[in-house]
Amino acid sequence: MILYSKRAQSAGSRANMLFFFLLAMVLTAIISGCAGKNFSILRPGIEVRGHYIDGVPFYQQKNSLCGPAAIASVLGFWGRTASLDQITAAVYLPELRGTLPMDMEHFMREAGFDTITSAGTLEELKVRIRTGLPVICLLDLGFGPYRQPHYVTVIGFDDANAVIIAHDGLKANSVIGYNTFENEWTRAGHWMLTANPRSSKDMQ
C-alpha cells in the first residue's frame, strides 16, 4: 500500500506539472496578441508605427547554439564575416549547453567592437533600435522553476501592434508580443548587448 501510494503521488505530481505546462502555453498564446501575425503583413508602414532595421542577416541555429547565431547576425550586419563554427568554438560551453553573456561581450570586443551591456527597459531597447543598432537580448523561455535561456537579435518593433521583431535563431523576423517579450526578458534580467565597430563615432 505504501508503494502504491508513492506511485500514485508521483503520477499525480507529473499530471500537475503537465497541467501547469499546458496552461502556461495557453496563457502565452493568449497574451502574445498580435504575435501570431506574419512579419510580411506588418512590414508595410512599420516606420510610422515603430522601426525596422534592414540588412541584418539571419542565421539558423544548430541545437542550443542561439548565442553564436545572434553574434553572427550582428557581425554580418556590420559587414564582418565569421562562420558559426568559429564563433561556437570561441564562446560555446558544452558543459552548460549554452553561452555566457560575458563571453558574448568578450567575443565582440575581441572582434573589434565597442560594446554596451545593460539591464535595459523596453523603451531603452526601442531607442537603440531607432538609432539603427541591432540588439542581442537574453530571454528565458522557461516557466516556473524551469529555465531555458535563449538569445535573440532584436531588429524592430511596432507600437501599434505591440510587437517586437527579432531573429530568434529558429525563424527570421519572428514577431513577439510586448507582453510575452517583457515576461521572458524579465526572467533573464533584462540583459541586452549592443555592439558597434570601434572605428564608428555613432555609439550612443
Please report, for each region that a protein language model flagged, where it lies by residue.
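Sec-dependent bacterial lipoprotein signal peptides
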Residues: 2-32
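Active-site-adjacent structural segments surrounding the nucleophilic cysteine of cysteine proteases
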Residues: 27, 31-97, 122, 141, ...
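Noncatalytic regulatory segments and standalone regulatory/sensor domains
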Residues: 35-40, 158-204
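Surface-exposed charge patches
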Residues: 73, 106, 126-127
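Mid-chain, structured segments of secreted extracytoplasmic proteins
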Residues: 88-123
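Anion (oxyanion) recognition and catalysis
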Residues: 109, 129, 186
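Active-site-adjacent substructure of cysteine-protease-like catalytic cores
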Residues: 114, 118-168, 175
